[in-house]
């Protein structure tokens, strides 16, 4: 019986980003119609963590919009992490942009076990999807994460017009980092964003198979865009090599109802992991 890891996301600061990532609705430059707010209350975050635990999630990710983990964001995330861990037995993940070693050490001391920072795509293609910061800054953050003893979760977004060569270059870069987890996102179109999706189900299955074969020791996560590219046939991606999904909503896009995902997983014979 294949074991599947479930991860829930809490977008604790939404839509306040000045970067120009062409795939992201949280950038203020594109004017996407999303829910924007500065900070969720700590009480709300704790309640969401409890709900995630009830939905069998073994990981709970605290996500903030913006380029980097600045001092104010660091204080907020640490406070949220400590509050959650007082009441919920769950693995905490942070996703707060580029970060230096000292800030990451503080997160670790607050109870963060995993840090998610995606390279998104190849070094060569990155300038075509973002001009306000570099791919190298992202790679450096990933190295910082590993150097302080936090587990690295690092993946990308597919179907943004990248070539097969870009995907291979991206894989080669990930091999240097050896992440514990690799989220595979499939670009979600929005009428305000300047990109159009270049993916379909066959493409997505190929991506899953390719990454599962290249990274046999990593957790391969079906993340954003799962419902769009696979519809109700997303368990095919689990059989193709993925062993994790995001349960519940994404950052600004609605996900499937957790009870429906759980019902499908159990019905099709998958085991749900108790910890990650």
Label the model's feature ranges.
Residues 172-276:
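Auxiliary Fe-S-binding modules of radical SAM enzymes
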Residues 6-44:
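Canonical Radical SAM [4Fe-4S] cluster-binding loop centered on the CxxxCxxC motif
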Residues 45-48, 76-84, 103, 137-142, ...:
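A general structural detector for well-ordered alpha-helical segments in enzyme core domains, enriched
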Residues 21, 62, 117, 145, ...:
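Conserved, mostly hydrophobic/aromatic
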Residues 28-48, 52-142, 151-155, 180-185:
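Core AdoMet radical
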Residues 85-86, 146, 266:
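Anion (oxyanion) recognition and catalysis
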Residues 99-109, 160-175, 227-240:
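Catalytic cores of alpha/beta
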Residues 67-70, 141-165, 184-197, 219-229:
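Conserved strand-turn element in the central/C-terminal portion of the radical SAM core barrel
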